[in-house]
Amino acid sequence: VPCQIFQDDTKTLIKTIVTRINDISHTSVSAKQSVTGLDFIPGLHPILSLSKMDQTLAVYQQVLTSLPSQNVLQIANDLENLRDLLHLLAFSKSCSLPQTSGLHKPESLDGVLEALLYSTEVVALSRLQGSLQDILQQLDISPEC
């Protein structure tokens, strides 16, 4: 299967996830907003390789699955599918991505979730949206492993 198919499917899923995030009304917060205790959520920085994309998405997936909000369940599932597509894309380019499914849960996550549920969701979704836009741009220039 040509890697272009995986790349196209990946782009389509990213656009779907961005649309889902836009449909959740409270995401009009800046991705650059700083909220004390949420520094474990990846910020906006260039994501240049497939392995870095996967690592970043794994953190977002972990954060979103830890939130009790029904709004983010579908997005978390979409992230799992997106990571699977990235692995297929990497495989089609003869890359091997390290398994990141067993990520270490940030120590601060449980305490932060109790105290800042709403803020965590807003910041995570806002930053995820920015990261997805960045990944979409990187896919256009065919990222390295």
Curated annotation (Swiss-Prot):
It comes from the Eukaryota. The gene is LEP. It holds the Pfam family Leptin. One of its GO terms (cellular component) is extracellular space. It comes from Meleagris gallopavo (Wild turkey). Keywords: Disulfide bond, Obesity, Secreted. This is Leptin. Disulfide bonds join C95-C145. Gene3D superfamilies: 1.20.1250.10. The lineage of its organism: Eukaryota, Metazoa, Chordata, Craniata, Vertebrata. InterPro entries: 4_helix_cytokine-like_core, Leptin. Key player in the regulation of energy balance and body weight control. Once released into the circulation, has central and peripheral effects by binding LEPR, found in many tissues, which results in the activation of several major signaling pathways. Belongs to the leptin family. GO terms for molecular function: hormone activity; peptide hormone receptor binding. GO terms for biological process: energy reserve metabolic process; lipid metabolic process; negative regulation of apoptotic process; negative regulation of appetite by leptin-mediated signaling pathway; phagocytosis; positive regulation of estradiol secretion; positive regulation of female gonad development; positive regulation of interleukin-12 production. It is found in: Secreted.
